[in-house]
Regions:
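Alpha-helical transmembrane segments of multi-pass small-molecule/ion transporters
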Residues: 117, 132, 157-158
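Active-site-adjacent beta-strand anchor residues
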Residues: 103, 134, 160
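N-terminal Rossmann-fold NAD(P) dinucleotide-binding loop
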Residues: 141-142
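N-terminal ligand-binding/catalytic initiation module
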Residues: 1-109, 116-118, 125-128
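Gly/Ala-rich phosphate-binding loop of Rossmann-like dinucleotide-binding domains
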Residues: 145, 149-150
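Short helix-loop-beta connector
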Residues: 124-131, 153
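NAD(P)-binding Rossmann-fold cofactor-contacting core
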Residues: 151-161
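Glycine-rich Rossmann-fold phosphate-binding loop(s) that bind the pyrophosphate
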Residues: 137-138
Length: 161
């Protein structure tokens, strides 16, 4: 049976578990996958460019699961009431091809991107760091600030946009 995960579902998970748990648990999953990076069958993203934007397909797999992310970038979309970036993806069983999950990946990617940055900072920053600079305050900035707060204890932000 294929599960459908919507943006509302992801938001509800964050609300129910709380952002601290979501960010710290997600960091553990991201780290576990980085540690087994060589096990993944990776290829370069496939991009389809047009005069109005780009659509990219990003596949990856290991011996058990195949997944892809479909993401667009269309800068003029807000003029039509659409998001500049929208993403969805699928997860399937390699042995049978059975689709296990169809998921929104716009909000999920924002969470994962922030956690990946916090993971890198955890490895590179001084352990006593409590201040962060954010240059650019677009859609991703809030997720970055939250991940750095919950994962690294950042309590002071300097922002510039």
């Amino acid at each position: 049976m294929t599960t459908l995960l919507t943006t509302s579902d992801v938001a509800n998970i964050v609300a129910l578990q709380g952002p601290r748990k979501v960010f710290t648990d997600l960091l553990d999953y991201v780290l576990a996958d980085f540690l087994r990076w060589q096990e993944f069958d990776k290829c370069a993203r496939v991009a389809s460019h047009s005069a109005t934007g780009v659509i990219e397909l990003m596949p990856t797999a290991d011996n058990e699961l195949y997944s892809f992310k479909f993401v667009n970038g269309h800068p003029d979309n807000p003029q039509a009431g659409l998001s500049t970036v929208m993403a969805f993806g699928a997860l399937a069983q390699v042995s049978t091809g059975e689709p296990l999950l169809i998921s929104e990946l716009t909000l999920t990617t924002a969470l994962r991107t922030a956690v990946t940055s916090a993971l890198a900072a955890r490895a590179l920053a001084r352990p006593d760091s409590r201040t962060m600079a954010l240059i650019g305050n677009g859609a991703q900035a809030e997720f970055q600030a939250l991940a750095f707060h919950y994962v690294l204890g950042i309590d002071t932000l300097h922002v510039y946009d």
